[in-house]
Amino acid sequence: FAAVPRLVVTGPSDGENVEGNSIEIAGFTDKDAKLTINEQPIIVNDRGEFKENVLLQKGINAIKISSTNRFEKSASETFNIKSNYQTPELANIESEGKVSGDEDARKSGVSVIVRAESVPTWLSVEADGNLIYSGTMLPGAIQNFDGEKEVRVTSGKANQTFVRVNGKAEKKLADDPGIVRDVVFTIGD
């Protein structure tokens, strides 16, 4: 007889409200268990602890955390997190026609807006060689990443990841449904 794995989520709490567009999910489980957040695999350290950033969309976000042991027994918890975040696209529409020095300065770098389509998607983003985001984007979540020379994107579900580079038309990161690593965007893109 095998027991279900232990799963303790230390944060966030169900029903939490956040002003931003991301939240850190943390807790612990059995060290040999397979952990997922919204069906995306998450690394568990050798003490069974986990910590993962999840990008949110505006409104209510359902986050399901599951832990499965080697006997295929599982435990899960579901949280509803409310985000009051305004997406970059909406902010751009509201400020259209207004030009400031900050906007002119930003145009000299690289701007990449990333959107997760219909499934939770793991994402890693580097700007100018520095890791600036690693976590899971929920469906519909949008995040803007800026770099001086380049922005490099790795996605766990490339065909569900859409990018808008330097204000140009949105496009799919790749047609491949799997992992695509180190797609580089530069000032000229």
Q: For each of these PLM feature ranges, what is it?
A:
Residues F1-Q86:
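Ser/Thr-rich low-complexity repeats and stalk/linker segments
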Residues G15-N17, N92-I142:
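Extracytoplasmic/periplasm-facing segments of secreted or lipoprotein envelope proteins
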Residues V18, N84-S108, L173-D189:
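Intrinsically disordered, low-complexity Ser/Thr-rich linker and spacer segments
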Residues S22-E24, E49-K51, G109-S111, G140, ...:
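Transmembrane beta-barrel architecture of outer membranes
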Residues A26-K34, A116-T121, K157-Q160:
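Short proline/glycine-enriched turn/loop motifs at strand-loop junctions of beta-rich domains
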Residues G59-I63, V110, V151:
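Exposed beta-strand face motif in extracellular beta-rich ectodomains
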Residues S124-E126, N130-S134, L138-D189:
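Extracytoplasmic
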